[in-house]
Amino acid sequence: FIDKVSTDIYELDRGQICKYEGKFDYYLEKKAERQQQESVSLAKAKNLYKKELEWIRRMPQARGTKSRARIEAFNELKETITAPTPTKSAELTVKAQRIGGKILEINNINKSFGEKQIINDFSHIYKKGDKIGIIGKNGCGKTTFLDIITETIKPDSGKVTLGQTIKIGYYTQNPPAEKSDTKVIDIVKKISEHIQLADGTAMGASQYLTHFGIPPYKQHTHYGNLSGGEKRLLNLLCILISNPNFLILDEPTNDLDIYTQMKLETFLEQYQGCLMVVSHDRHFLDRIVSQLFVFRPEGKIKEFPGNYTD
């Protein structure tokens, strides 16, 4: 969307506005270069600060003009190294449970609402590593399809068979209700206080929430004080840390800011389980899926190898 309607990108970053002349990919490239330059400059400033700090400690009192100027420069240097820095885009992939030989089989399912055919005789056998995007017009039956897969509703005919080792994590557009006076961090800790990552390490619940855009002060507020978008983000993160090996996501990027969405994209790119996602975001689908289910009129679902651009 940004590429089609804009020629320049302005970013508000740590109280400053940075201009990037070009498309979104150009912005990402130049932003990474700028952050790299900032990291080098910050490292040099920290080394100089250590040397100047030793001088400050040795100087009992600044009497001369040169000494006072050096102290002023030291104070400016201190402000530089203590200023906010850009958040590092760490790559955090939750450890998925083991997947057995049988994952999910859909056999000749049909679903109608009244005279409207939503799904017409669809079959599919899922394989390890499948990452499938689901696209179609609003109201064509995409969410109904996910509800059938997760056994939230039943098909009119046909069968869905889930493998014994499969644990589904289902993200819907309507998060489950939590008590309004429950703290955000307690909701997460109820699932797990330490999140097991794919590389064998673990991360505290608070640190994981911070990475995905829920800062510490928000973690200790009550659930009832969150906005609708914040509640959906919290629900998504709770699903991710429950270690599912089959993720089913219905419009997961709605209400996410661009940086949280980029972190989610990185997470899903590295995700080792199976994935099925409904989204209208073409860029998002291009990054994470390798196959599409395209909903056609009269309940027909066409399988297409490739991403949205393909």
Where are these regions (language model features)?
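ABC ATP-binding cassette signature C-motif
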Residues: 1-42, 92-310
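Intracellular alpha-helical coupling/juxtamembrane segments of multi-pass membrane proteins
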Residues: 30-63, 67-71, 77-81
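Alpha-helical coupling/stalk and coiled-coil linker elements that connect catalytic or binding modules
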Residues: 52-61, 75-76, 90-96, 102-105
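A general structural signal marking secondary-structure boundaries and capping sites
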Residues: 60-63, 78-81, 85, 195, ...
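Active-site phosphate-binding and catalytic loops of NTP-dependent enzymes
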Residues: 82-89, 158
